[in-house]
Amino acid sequence: MPCILIVDDESDFIELLQYRLAGLGCEFIVAGNGVQALSQARQLKPDLILLDILLPDLDGLSVCEILRRQPSTKKTPIIFMSALSSEVTKRTVAMQADDFFTKPLDLERLQLRITELLHRELLMAK
């Protein structure tokens, strides 16, 4: 069963995502800030990370940069989620994230993108 790490400081938003993405048949782990996200990613090695940009303690851009330098997480698909706009999108691509979704999220499109990325990872693992 694929594992998705959801990183956001809004617990209601995390619950909504878990509910709406339940049909994907994935296990979810959560982190409420950047430091927790790094710890969870290193220990549990999720198959995909949904990462908010505005987080307490360590922002999502910094988390992504650190994860991309770690051998165990450098190829893990990362999807940024944020209410921030296009300038952030450009920086996201430069940081090697796999995608960027503006809040409020288009959940159908997000589900499709998650499925694509997990399928890609499965094929690359073979």
Give residue spans per PLM region:
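Active-site residues of response regulator receiver
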Residues: D8, D52, S82
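The feature encodes the CheY-like receiver
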Residues: I14, P56, S86
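Charged docking surfaces used in two-component/phosphorelay signaling
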Residues: E15-G23
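Alpha4 helix (beta4-alpha4-beta5 surface) of REC/receiver domains from two-component response regulators
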Residues: Q18, S62, L84-T102, L112
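Short hydrophobic/Thr-rich beta-strand motif most characteristic of the beta2 strand and flanking loop
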Residues: G25-G32, Q40
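Acidic catalytic/metal-coordinating carboxylates
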Residues: N33-Q36, D59-S62
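Active-site beta3 strand of CheY-like receiver
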Residues: L44-L50, L55
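The C-terminal output helix
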Residues: T115-K126
